[in-house]
Structures are given as C-alpha cells and as structure tokens.
C-alpha cells in the first residue's frame, strides 16, 4: 500500500519539483564545510564541543542486551526496528538512500529495498506533503528534512495540513502515522543555515508533537514512541551529538513515553530545565553550583516540547523556589517564555526570585562568533548566582 501511494504521489510531485532545487549551491558549500565528507562531522565536533561535556545515561538492562552506539547509530537502530516490525513503514528524504548526510539511514535501503527507503527531490514542502499522503492511507511515513533550518518551506504542510487533518475531518481521517526527523541545533561550524533551533515555531501549533532527545538511549526510545504515536510528530536530533554522544543502547526496540520530563538530578535550591544538547550544559552548571556555591540544583530534561510536562516542572519549582531555563534558540519568543509564563501562573507564591532565561541572542546564528552566541555554562552559572543572591 505504501509503495503504491509513494509511486502515485511521486509522479505528480516530480513534475513540480524543478523550482525547488535552490539548494544545490548550499549543498556544495556543505561539502566544503565537511558535512558530507566522510568523517567531516567527527573533526568539527571534536574541535568545537568545548562548551559542554556529554553525560551518558546509566546502562539500562531492563530492555535486554545493549550495544555501544553513538546518537546517529541509535537513530539507525530505531529506524531498522520500525521497518522490521511494520511492513507499511517507509523512509524518504534527500539522500536517505545512500545513508543520509549524517549516516542515520545507512544500510537500510540495501536491507529493505528501494520501495521502502528512497530519495526525494530537494523540496521540503513536497517531502512533508508526500508523507501526509502516505500516512493518510494508513501506512507509516518517516520523513527526513536534511537540516531543521530547511523545514520552513514545509511549514504550511505541517501547520495547516498535518496538524489539522484529524480535527477538520471530525476524526474520520488522520495522518497520525507521520514522523518528521530533522538534524537540529548548533554544530560548531554551521553558521546561519545549519545551526538553528526552530522548536518554538511549532510549539504554537495544536495537533503535532515536538520531541528533542539528549542522548543515544533517549533518542532511540523517543523516536520509536514518535513513530508509533497516533499524532504527527516532529523529532529534532541534536546534530552535534551524532558522534559526540556515545553510550550503551538496547539492541531490541523499546519506547520512552512522550510528554514526560525526566528529573535526572534531584536538588533543593534551584530548578534547571533544558532539552537536547543544553541538558549537558546545565548538568555542568549544577556541578559548578554545588562545588562553588554549595547550591543544590534539580536538573530536568523536558524531552517533549509539545505537549510539555507542566506537572513535573511545577512540582520541582514549588520545592526549590527558583527556576532557570536554557535553550540555544533566541530569547524572544523562545519556548522558555512559555515555560516561564506557566510556572509564574502556577507557582507564583512559591518563587523566591524572578525566573531566569539563558538563551541564544536575538540575532541570526553567527559563524565565527558561535562561542559567544551559545548559552554556555558560564552564562548559565552567572544567571544562577544572581538568582541565589536575589
């Protein structure tokens, strides 16, 4: 069914794809930067991950045998599990047939065939629209947008079609089996068009879920939950962690519940909230605060941005009386604003200091000035110290 729908929709799509090839020059630029060169990401990431140290999760034995994987390998494992379990599942996007820019789909075309893992034109709107059509037939559509920065041409398809399909049909039809994957966040050399964190744009859109993992173990479990969820999901993958993050990951499929934040370190004085790569930054901040100030920090990984876990965050703030939220995206209109607003409504009388947001600047993402742009541990530590002294 999925293959028939793919071929039928593909014929119409290919006729209109010519105007969408605007990124050929950018692809060449990406080659020069090292995105597509074998090992290119390794060199860049080893050179530029000084703003954080990856903290692996403790090995979990409850899901059976584990294997050492980096983040992109855990993504591959999740996709492999999905294709093996669900004969209707298909994976498609730019260059996914040869393994993708970051190698997340490597080997899957050879294993499952060209009708289930295939390339698309350079047309994000078409990729997502195509995925909606696949999902409406009842098949499982796993679409890849090559970089989160290029998801915006597909904004109309995501916001006005995928998110509203079930609602506008009175639940007669839905495209809930659509999952959109996209590499996300800073990478050390991505500059304006390969570094953005656009989660807040989609947080304002009822009908979709937005998920961002912090580690290989989390990535596999959360991605499998997204793929099997009954709602369209956007799964943003921190690309700086593709190779920098390595830990033991179960070989067999397992799921981590969506919309459940995780308290990864308990504390009593300050609540620190982040997601994706920034979780590792605030974990370092928590250690610095304990060592230098004697301050006990509770660290929360939000994991699901929409719908987010209000109860876990508010319960923590009621205990600590202070909240610091950090993300790479710009400050104004960032998702930290939504968390801050909700917490002050729910926990106002418990707050001991103003809520602090430590985020990217309200500028385009810079290239050589990336180290000054990102909300590193020193910026977070300074903000925490101000809260303590308030």
From Swiss-Prot:
<dbReference type="InterPro" id="IPR033248">
    <property type="entry name" value="Transketolase_C"/>
</dbReference>
<dbReference type="GO" id="GO:0003863">
    <property type="term" value="F:3-methyl-2-oxobutanoate dehydrogenase (2-methylpropanoyl-transferring) activity"/>
</dbReference>
<feature type="binding site">
    <location>
        <position position="176"/>
    </location>
    <ligand>
        <name>K(+)</name>
    </ligand>
</feature>
<feature type="binding site">
    <location>
        <position position="231"/>
    </location>
    <ligand>
        <name>K(+)</name>
    </ligand>
</feature>
<feature type="modified residue" description="N6-acetyllysine">
    <location>
        <position position="230"/>
    </location>
</feature>
<dbReference type="GO" id="GO:0005654">
    <property type="term" value="C:nucleoplasm"/>
</dbReference>
<dbReference type="GO" id="GO:0005743">
    <property type="term" value="C:mitochondrial inner membrane"/>
</dbReference>
<dbReference type="GO" id="GO:0047101">
    <property type="term" value="F:branched-chain alpha-keto acid dehydrogenase activity"/>
</dbReference>
<dbReference type="GO" id="GO:0006629">
    <property type="term" value="P:lipid metabolic process"/>
</dbReference>
<keyword id="KW-0443">Lipid metabolism</keyword>
<keyword id="KW-0479">Metal-binding</keyword>
<dbReference type="GO" id="GO:0005759">
    <property type="term" value="C:mitochondrial matrix"/>
</dbReference>
<dbReference type="GO" id="GO:0005739">
    <property type="term" value="C:mitochondrion"/>
</dbReference>
<feature type="binding site">
    <location>
        <position position="179"/>
    </location>
    <ligand>
        <name>K(+)</name>
    </ligand>
</feature>
<keyword id="KW-0630">Potassium</keyword>
<dbReference type="GO" id="GO:0005730">
    <property type="term" value="C:nucleolus"/>
</dbReference>
<dbReference type="GO" id="GO:0009083">
    <property type="term" value="P:branched-chain amino acid catabolic process"/>
</dbReference>
<feature type="binding site">
    <location>
        <position position="226"/>
    </location>
    <ligand>
        <name>K(+)</name>
    </ligand>
</feature>
<dbReference type="GO" id="GO:0046872">
    <property type="term" value="F:metal ion binding"/>
</dbReference>
<keyword id="KW-0007">Acetylation</keyword>
<feature type="modified residue" description="N6-acetyllysine">
    <location>
        <position position="239"/>
    </location>
</feature>
<comment type="subunit">
    <text>Heterotetramer of 2 alpha/BCKDHA and 2 beta chains/BCKDHB that forms the branched-chain alpha-keto acid decarboxylase (E1) component of the BCKD complex. The branched-chain alpha-ketoacid dehydrogenase is a large complex composed of three major building blocks E1, E2 and E3. It is organized around E2, a 24-meric cubic core composed of DBT, to which are associated 6 to 12 copies of E1, and approximately 6 copies of the dehydrogenase E3, a DLD dimer.</text>
</comment>
<keyword id="KW-0496">Mitochondrion</keyword>
<keyword id="KW-0560">Oxidoreductase</keyword>
<dbReference type="InterPro" id="IPR005475">
    <property type="entry name" value="Transketolase-like_Pyr-bd"/>
</dbReference>
<dbReference type="GO" id="GO:0009063">
    <property type="term" value="P:amino acid catabolic process"/>
</dbReference>
<dbReference type="Pfam" id="PF02780">
    <property type="entry name" value="Transketolase_C"/>
</dbReference>
<dbReference type="GO" id="GO:0160157">
    <property type="term" value="C:branched-chain alpha-ketoacid dehydrogenase complex"/>
</dbReference>
<feature type="binding site">
    <location>
        <position position="178"/>
    </location>
    <ligand>
        <name>K(+)</name>
    </ligand>
</feature>
<feature type="binding site">
    <location>
        <position position="229"/>
    </location>
    <ligand>
        <name>K(+)</name>
    </ligand>
</feature>
<feature type="binding site">
    <location>
        <position position="150"/>
    </location>
    <ligand>
        <name>thiamine diphosphate</name>
    </ligand>
</feature>
<comment type="function">
    <text>Together with BCKDHA forms the heterotetrameric E1 subunit of the mitochondrial branched-chain alpha-ketoacid dehydrogenase (BCKD) complex. The BCKD complex catalyzes the multi-step oxidative decarboxylation of alpha-ketoacids derived from the branched-chain amino-acids valine, leucine and isoleucine producing CO2 and acyl-CoA which is subsequently utilized to produce energy. The E1 subunit catalyzes the first step with the decarboxylation of the alpha-ketoacid forming an enzyme-product intermediate.</text>
</comment>
<protein>
    <recommendedName>
        <fullName>2-oxoisovalerate dehydrogenase subunit beta, mitochondrial</fullName>
        <ecNumber>1.2.4.4</ecNumber>
    </recommendedName>
</protein>
<keyword id="KW-0809">Transit peptide</keyword>
<feature type="transit peptide" description="Mitochondrion">
    <location>
        <begin position="1"/>
        <end position="48"/>
    </location>
</feature>
<dbReference type="InterPro" id="IPR029061">
    <property type="entry name" value="THDP-binding"/>
</dbReference>
<dbReference type="Pfam" id="PF02779">
    <property type="entry name" value="Transket_pyr"/>
</dbReference>
<dbReference type="InterPro" id="IPR009014">
    <property type="entry name" value="Transketo_C/PFOR_II"/>
</dbReference>
């Amino acid at each position: 069914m999925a293959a028939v729908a793919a071929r039928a929709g593909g014929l119409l799509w290919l006729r209109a794809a010519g105007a969408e090839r605007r990124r050929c020059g950018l692809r060449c630029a990406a080659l020069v930067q090292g995105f597509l060169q074998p090992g290119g990401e390794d060199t860049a990431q080893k050179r530029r991950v000084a703003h954080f140290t990856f903290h692996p999760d403790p090995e979990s034995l409850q899901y059976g045998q584990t294997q050492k994987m980096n983040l992109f390998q855990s993504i591959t494992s999740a996709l492999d599990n999905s294709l093996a379990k669900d004969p209707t599942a298909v994976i498609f996007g730019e260059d996914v047939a040869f393994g993708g820019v970051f190698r997340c789909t490597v080997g899957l075309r050879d294993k499952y065939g060209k009708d289930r893992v295939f390339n698309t034109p350079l047309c994000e709107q078409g990729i997502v629209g195509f995925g909606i059509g696949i999902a409406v037939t009842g098949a499982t559509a796993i679409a890849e947008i090559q970089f989160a920065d290029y998801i915006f041409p597909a904004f109309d398809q995501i916001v006005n079609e995928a998110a509203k399909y079930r609602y506008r049909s009175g639940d007669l039809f839905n495209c809930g089996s659509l999952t959109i994957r996209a590499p996300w966040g800073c990478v050390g050399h991505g500059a304006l068009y390969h570094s953005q964190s656009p989660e807040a744009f989609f947080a304002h859109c009822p009908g979709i879920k937005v998920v961002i993992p912090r580690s290989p173990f989390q990535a596999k479990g959360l991605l499998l939950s997204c793929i099997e969820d009954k709602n369209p999901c956007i799964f943003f993958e921190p690309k700086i962690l593709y190779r920098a993050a390595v830990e033991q990951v179960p070989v067999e499929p397992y799921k981590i519940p969506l919309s459940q934040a995780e308290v990864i370190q308990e504390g009593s004085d300050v609540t620190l909230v982040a997601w994706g790569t920034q979780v590792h930054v605030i974990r370092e901040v928590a250690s610095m605060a304990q060592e230098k100030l004697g301050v006990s920090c509770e660290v929360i990984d939000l994991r699901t941005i929409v719908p987010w876990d209000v109860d876990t965050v508010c319960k923590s703030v009621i205990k600590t009386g202070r909240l610091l939220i950090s993300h790479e995206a710009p400050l104004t209109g960032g998702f930290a604003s939504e968390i801050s607003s909700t917490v002050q409504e729910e926990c106002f009388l418990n707050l001991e200091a103003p809520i602090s947001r430590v985020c990217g600047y309200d500028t385009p993402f810079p290239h050589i000035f990336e180290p000054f742009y990102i909300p590193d541990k020193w910026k977070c530590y300074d903000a925490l110290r101000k809260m303590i002294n308030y």
